[in-house]
Amino acid sequence: MNELTHVNSAYLRHHAKNPIHWKFWSDGILELAVQENKLIILSIGYSACHWCHVMEKETFRNELIANFMNQNFICIKIDREEHPEIDHIYMDFILNTKGNGGWPLNCILLPDTKPVFAGTYYKADDWLNLISRFYTIFKENPDKLIAYSKNYIEHLN
């Protein structure tokens, strides 16, 4: 179930009718990701972001994509204006791994919230291909993603 129906954020309310079961960033939902051993899709944006609205319309309203995300990931949506501290963590990741960033900021995280991928806007087919690849890698060889994340964190230290 999408949890964004009764929120103050105009940006999050805009996603309330998405077929994706968007959740809030909370200790409970993060514990659920660990218990279910699921990757997290973290999508961060804000109301005035043009490409956030385009991706919401083209990608996040797509039933096929929503079904795949709902079955295989914990899906979290954040308004960067409400949680700049979370946005900052994952914006640092994309800046350090790709050299540039922006919004929407779409991340794939391990169940313990360590990042393994970050990108910005994706068309529907590209997004589905991307998340399908990460899902398959995590199911078939999770150590590969865990090692990548560990190497990134060690590189920063």
Each model region followed by its residue ranges:
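Replace the tail clause
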Residues: 1-157
